[in-house]
């Protein structure tokens, strides 16, 4: 339910990620969330858990420890109205920069919670290249953007099966975040197609929670390549930096890993059994990427 990034000395860039799951089950154990203390998930307990967690978040904003608020995963709009109203109340009171995500089918639910200027932030709309109503979703997103000028609206698409749809969506929007374009032949098609369109900004991002594929790195050929993994960003030149630090500040692999909140572990079955294997996997992936970049430099 909640994911807390490590706090930094610079209060202006402190932020809290809130991960809502449709089942209200928690993916992370952190001090903002009490859900891991309960084994049952009755409606009453879940509501109390949410209220207790929001009390902690309220106090954190009041103390100045947090400035940004990111709601990710699941659907904010399926929460009980009293909880949703409480979140909006906190957001309006402390005016943090609010990051929101939604899938296309639930986009219409976002038109209600916010008035034109009451909060500001960013809305990421997730699409899939096999959706039948993908262009209707894009149209609804553009309506939201025009009626909510304080929100920057972006789009992300799972690009796996229908290249023509991806290209058409990109032509409409001019900017599109590509997520999980992992099939080798498909990734090559995307990068080859848009080598001729340098005016478009393409970012290829691979979510840290999914399975990694070393071939994925070696087949991406775009100048704007970034890979985000649990607070670590590796840019196309092989430079390692942290999401919650200045882009101009470089880190070694060891320094970056030391900055990760090691006590925050994924509760999915394949992760809890491995006793921290998720962090070892991240280390392996960074190593593989570093070796790849060294090979490119030698060439």
Language-model features and meaning:
Residues 1-16, 36, 239-299:
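Flexible mid-to-C-terminal extensions adjoining Fe-S/redox cofactors in radical SAM and related proteins
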Residues 6-52, 244:
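Canonical Radical SAM [4Fe-4S] cluster-binding loop centered on the CxxxCxxC motif
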Residues 20, 24-27, 221, 260, ...:
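Processing junctions and N-termini across compartments
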Residues 21-24, 29-36, 74, 126-129, ...:
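Short loop/turn segments at strand-loop or loop-helix junctions that form parts
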Residues 29, 39-42, 78-80, 108-109, ...:
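Short catalytic/ligand-binding loop motif for oxyanion handling, primarily in non-cytosolic enzymes
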Residues 42, 72-73:
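Glycine-rich phosphate-binding "P-loop"
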Residues 53-72, 79-180:
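Radical SAM/AdoMet-radical enzyme domain recognition
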Residues 164-250, 297:
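A C-terminal junction/extension of Radical SAM enzymes
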């Amino acid at each position: 339910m909640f994911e807390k990034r490590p706090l930094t000395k610079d209060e202006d860039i402190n932020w809290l990620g809130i991960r809502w799951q449709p089942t209200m089950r928690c993916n992370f154990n952190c001090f903002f969330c009490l859900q891991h203390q309960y084994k049952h998930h009755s409606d009453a307990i879940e509501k109390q858990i949410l209220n207790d967690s929001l009390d902690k978040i309220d106090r954190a904003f009041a103390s100045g420890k947090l400035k940004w608020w990111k709601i990710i995963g699941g659907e904010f709009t399926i929460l009980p109205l009293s909880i949703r109203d409480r979140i909006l109340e906190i957001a309006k009171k402390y005016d943090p920069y609010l990051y929101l995500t939604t899938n296309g089918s639930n986009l219409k639910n976002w038109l209600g919670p916010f008035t034109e200027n009451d909060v500001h932030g960013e809305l990421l709309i997730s699409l899939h290249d096999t959706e039948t109503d993908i262009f209707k979703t894009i149209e609804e997103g553009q309506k939201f953007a025009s009626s909510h000028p304080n929100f920057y609206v972006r789009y992300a698409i799972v690009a796996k099966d229908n290249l023509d749809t991806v290209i058409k969506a990109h032509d409409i929007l001019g900017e599109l975040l590509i997520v999980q374009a992992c099939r080798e032949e498909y990734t090559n098609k995307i990068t080859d197609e848009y080598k001729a369109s340098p005016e478009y900004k393409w970012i290829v991002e691979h979510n840290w929670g999914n399975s990694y594929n070393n071939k994925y790195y070696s087949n991406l050929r775009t100048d704007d390549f970034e890979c985000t993994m649990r607070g670590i960003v590796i840019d196309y030149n092989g430079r390692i930096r942290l999401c919650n630090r200045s882009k101009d500040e470089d880190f070694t692999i060891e320094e970056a890993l030391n900055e990760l909140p090691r006590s925050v572990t994924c509760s999915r079955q394949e992760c809890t059994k491995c006793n921290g294997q998720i962090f070892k996997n991240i280390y392996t992936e960074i190593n593989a990427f570093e070796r790849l970049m060294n090979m490119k430099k030698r060439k």
